[in-house]
Amino acid sequence: MNLLGKMIYVEGFMMIMATLLVSMSYGHRAMINDVAEAPVFDDVVSPNGLDSSWYDARATFYGDIHGGETQQGACGYGDLFKQGYGLETAALSTALFNEGYTCGACYQIMCVNDPQWCLPGSVKITATNFCPPDYSKTEGVWCNPPQKHFDLSLPMFLKIAQYKAGVVPVKYRRISCARTGGVKFETKGNPYFLMILPYNVGGAGDIKLMQVKGDKTGWITMQKNWGQNWTTGVNLTGQGISFRVTTSDGVTKDFNNVMPNNWGFGQTFDGKINF
């Protein structure tokens, strides 16, 4: 073989090898993607300072296709449709509910590892209720500690799994709550037991600290009563009221002059801003 022939042969061989290497490299990347535990959703934002890793859990459903039995609940919310949560809700097991401190938090959930029953895609839900443990049973006790379980509304369950599945393995993670409008503050109680239910909370969604201030007082730390209801024994009737709210990711916002001095119990006030 002359010199020109050898050069052509070597160049051709190098081109073939380069093509093979690129093909192998692409194939390796594809294989990694195929075995990844969870996809990345570009439209999902993680809350500041909160763990947004994927974790294992189970999910089932309660209520009917219209959301019956999912209203009210252990978080203290009322009409979930009027309050902006709709059908995108779930009751959480003891391990996730955290004595009500998780109320209002948002999660992304998808069915995994069960090709017979799982459907593609995911749902985004708000924690609005508690799935109580049942210590009288030894089987089907998904909500007993230490198990992590989501009792979804039926419409949400049907987006990720077939009805006949009943219960399915899932992956879940915390996500930022996207809300429309300001945080709302609902008043309950009496002059010596003011109870406030904040709802429609964006960002982390769940509240770890709440303070209240009247026209004639400084900031008063409220006590979490049950669910997401916060209380104080200080009589603030006849005063304009402001709130200071800290969500579980450590973000604090002041909601100034939310309630006028002629406010009454059973009313709801718009905080105008959100997280």
From Swiss-Prot:
Under the heading Pfam families, the entry gives: DPBB_1, Expansin_C
Q: Which UniProt keywords apply?
A: Cell wall, Cell wall biogenesis/degradation, Membrane, Secreted, Signal
The UniProt entry, under SUPFAM superfamilies, shows: Barwin-like endoglucanases, PHL pollen allergen
Q: How does it sit in the membrane?
A: Peripheral membrane protein
Q: Where is the Expansin-like EG45 domain?
A: 72-182
Q: What positions does the domain Expansin-like CBD occupy?
A: 192-271
Q: Which residues form the signal peptide?
A: 1-27
Return the Gene3D superfamilies for the record. Expansin, cellulose-binding-like domain, RlpA-like domain
User: What Gene Ontology cellular-component terms does the record carry?
Assistant: extracellular region; membrane
Localization: Secreted, Cell wall; Membrane
Q: Name the protein family.
A: Belongs to the expansin family. Expansin A subfamily.
Relate the protein's function as given in its record: Causes loosening and extension of plant cell walls by disrupting non-covalent bonding between cellulose microfibrils and matrix glucans. No enzymatic activity has been found.
Write down what this protein is called.
Expansin-A23
The gene that this protein is the product of is EXPA23
